[in-house]
UniProtKB/Swiss-Prot annotation:
Protein known as: Ribosomal RNA small subunit methyltransferase G
Any Pfam family hit: GidB
NCBIfam families linked: rsmG_gidB
Lineage start: Bacteria, Bacillati, Actinomycetota, Actinomycetes, Mycobacteriales
GO cellular component, one term: plasma membrane
Organism: Mycobacterium tuberculosis (strain ATCC 25618 / H37Rv)
EC number per UniProt: 2.1.1.-
Keywords, in A-Z order: Cytoplasm, Methyltransferase, rRNA processing, S-adenosyl-L-methionine, Transferase
Alphabetical list of Gene3D superfamilies matching this protein: Vaccinia Virus protein VP39
Subcellular location: Cytoplasm
Gene that encodes it: rsmG
Length: 224
């Protein structure tokens, strides 16, 4: 038995088979279509699927969750598999990625919504605003990410950004901009300590005030 299997069984439960099929899609068509690097195949479970799924510890039952810059479906798809009670929206601007997501979601039969667009676009904010949480992984620095996330979530909603070992440094660097963008209770937390070594590192923040219309669109650069 692989060291990953007990953790995967605990996290995905009876839907582990769906997680396996998703991993196969990432390792096959995902690599062939340039959505996953070939060197990532050997660590899909610990570094990608499980690392993403465990942030469900920070979500409430029935939450509407927007995955910003979903790419190949991370972290949104592992969350949707592990937590079928969640209402997961995969937000991704690139056509080739949304095509992959639609094919994969249809094959898996998981209940997720796919939206092709960017977080800073007004129509996206109109459609997805008021969500309970915005999640992301490897999308952008925290200053931009906060400006993109806050307009999509309700007051007191959560921003959950999966980060690496520099998470504390990044929070120190961007805290002022994050607060100016409406974030409160900004902190670094870990998830999955019972299953992963090391556990997933997440920058957690809440939306603490009303966001000025268009604040996200003033962020320089484009979103993934």
């Amino acid at each position: 038995m692989s060291p990953i299997e007990p953790a995967a069984s605990a996290i995905f439960g009876p839907r582990l088979g769906l997680a396996r099929r998703y991993a196969e899609a990432l390792a096959g068509p995902g690599v062939e279509r340039g959505l996953v690097g070939p060197r990532e195949v050997g660590r899909l479970w610990d570094r990608h699927l499980l690392n993403c799924a465990v942030i469900g510890e920070l979500l409430e039952r029935g939450d509407r969750v927007v995955d910003i810059g979903s790419g190949a479906g991370l972290p949104g798809v592992p969350l949707a598999i592990a937590r079928p009670d969640l209402q997961v929206v995969l937000l991704e601007p690139l056509l080739r990625r949304t095509e992959f997501l639609r094919e994969m979601v249809t094959d898996l039969g998981v209940a997720v919504e796919i939206v092709r667009g960017r977080a800073e676009e007004s129509w996206v904010q109109d459609q997805l605003g008021g969500s309970d949480a915005a999640v992301s992984r490897a999308v952008a620095a925290l200053d931009k990410l906060t400006k993109w996330s806050m307009p999509l979530i309700r007051p007191n909603g959560r921003m959950l950004a999966i980060k690496g070992e520099r998470a504390h440094d990044e929070v120190r660097e961007h805290r002022r901009v994050m607060i100016a963008s409406g974030a409160v209770d900004v902190r670094v937390v870990t998830c999955g300590a019972n299953y992963l070594r090391p556990p997933a590192t997440v920058v957690f923040a809440r939306r603490g005030k009303q966001i000025a219309r268009g604040s996200a669109r003033m962020a320089s650069g484009g979103t993934a």
